């Protein structure tokens, strides 16, 4: 699919971006938080846990579509609302094992996790993730104990101590100041300097949702996003990729400003966090040279920083550069 893009790109003007071909599997939409911009979370009487058979059907479609990543996402510490903690975590491990059997590398974003919980999941994941969102204490998070910055920083730090390749990022336009954005990026940079585990930082604009507190809010302007990506490129170590979601904003100006990754693009499932924002088709991104990667970045493929159970599949899927084998 990349060949058509490369034919469109011309000379030094071409922009280059990596991406991962994935399937997005929402494990559960039960969540202890009640963020003012979220339409993913469901109240306990409406929330559900995906069945193994449904997850397997999605993975089968992902196989057919040539995906290499299974993105597992769920609400924050749902067992504090309903259910058994160990039972859900063991089920998540079971889904990760199924993904590996089907040739898909798991990347799990399960919200706030303790070090013990990270240790349970890490062997079955090529990488993991948790958005920092902001170091500021914001009104929009006042009913969300899992969005306290110090709690999120602790999980990101614990992942670093365990050498888990990690994706994090900031959410832009949720009531934070420009200074807050810079401080958040500086904290991420410092965590990486300490542990070396941050593979990418997402700069994600708010997408206001009808029926939520964010409904009357305005997403950040493109000019502000371009400026922020440029600032992020100066603050973050060069080995950290800057990711921008291509279904939320035109990625081309942001790539020109210093972003270099488009994240997971799924030919199989919607973005369950922003389901009304469809993924672009790969060949719609004209003028961008797309390079397919795995959910674990080449640097960490070479370092061997990935879950022990993922090793054999990574060796099958990665080329000599650590990118997706074609």
Curated annotation (Swiss-Prot):
InterPro entries named in the record: Aldolase_TIM, CofG_family, Elp3/MiaA/NifB-like_rSAM, F420, rSAM
Alphabetized GO MF terms: 4 iron, 4 sulfur cluster binding; 7,8-didemethyl-8-hydroxy-5-deazariboflavin synthase activity; iron ion binding; transferase activity, transferring alkyl or aryl (other than methyl) groups
Cofactor binding comment, as recorded: Binds 1 [4Fe-4S] cluster. The cluster is coordinated with 3 cysteines and an exchangeable S-adenosyl-L-methionine.
Domain Radical SAM core: residue ranges: 17-247
Enzyme Commission number(s) of this protein: 4.3.1.32
PROSITE patterns: RADICAL_SAM (PS51918)
Gene3D superfamilies attached to this UniProt entry: Aldolase class I
Pfam families, A to Z: Radical_SAM
Catalytic activity: 5-amino-5-(4-hydroxybenzyl)-6-(D-ribitylimino)-5,6-dihydrouracil + S-adenosyl-L-methionine = 7,8-didemethyl-8-hydroxy-5-deazariboflavin + 5'-deoxyadenosine + L-methionine + NH4(+) + H(+)
Pathway membership, UniProt: Cofactor biosynthesis; coenzyme F0 biosynthesis
Enzyme class per UniProt: lyase
Function: Catalyzes the radical-mediated synthesis of 7,8-didemethyl-8-hydroxy-5-deazariboflavin from 5-amino-5-(4-hydroxybenzyl)-6-(D-ribitylimino)-5,6-dihydrouracil.
Family the entry assigns: Belongs to the radical SAM superfamily. CofG family.
Protein known as: 7,8-didemethyl-8-hydroxy-5-deazariboflavin synthase
Organismal lineage: Archaea, Methanobacteriati, Methanobacteriota, Stenosarchaea group, Methanomicrobia
């Amino acid at each position: 699919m990349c060949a058509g893009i490369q034919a469109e790109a011309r000379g030094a003007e071409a922009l280059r971006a990596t991406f991962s071909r994935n399937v997005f599997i929402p494990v559960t939409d039960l969540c202890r938080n009640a963020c003012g911009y979220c339409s993913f979370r469901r109240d306990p009487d409406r929330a559900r846990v995906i069945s193994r058979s449904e997850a397997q059907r999605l993975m089968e479609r992902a196989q057919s579509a040539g995906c290499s990543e299974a993105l597992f996402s769920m609400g924050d510490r749902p067992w504090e609302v309903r259910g058994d903690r160990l039972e859900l975590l063991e089920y998540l491990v079971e889904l990760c094992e199924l993904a590996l059997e089907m040739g898909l590398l798991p990347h799990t974003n399960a919200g706030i996790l303790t070090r013990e919980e990270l240790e349970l999941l890490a062997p079955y994941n090529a990488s993991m993730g948790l958005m920092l969102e902001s170091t500021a204490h914001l009104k929009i998070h006042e009913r969300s104990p899992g969005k306290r910055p110090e709690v999120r920083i602790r999980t990101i730090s614990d992942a670093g101590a365990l050498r888990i390749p990690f994706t994090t990022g900031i959410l832009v336009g949720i009531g934070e100041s420009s200074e807050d954005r810079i401080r958040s990026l500086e904290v991420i940079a410092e965590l990486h300097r300490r542990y070396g585990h941050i593979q990418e930082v997402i700069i994600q604009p708010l997408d206001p949702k009808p029926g939520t507190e964010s409904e009357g809010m305005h997403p950040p302007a493109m000019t502000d996003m371009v400026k922020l990506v440029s600032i992020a490129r100066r603050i973050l170590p060069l080995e950290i990729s800057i990711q921008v979601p291509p279904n939320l904003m035109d990625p081309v100006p942001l790539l020109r400003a210093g972003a270099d990754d488009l994240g997971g693009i799924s030919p199989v499932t919607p973005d369950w966090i922003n389901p009304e924002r469809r993924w672009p088709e790969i060949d719609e991104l004209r003028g961008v040279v797309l390079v397919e990667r795995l959910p674990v970045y080449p640097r960490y493929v070479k370092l061997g920083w990935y879950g022990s159970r993922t090793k054999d599949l990574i060796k099958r899927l990665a080329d000599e550069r650590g990118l997706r084998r074609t």
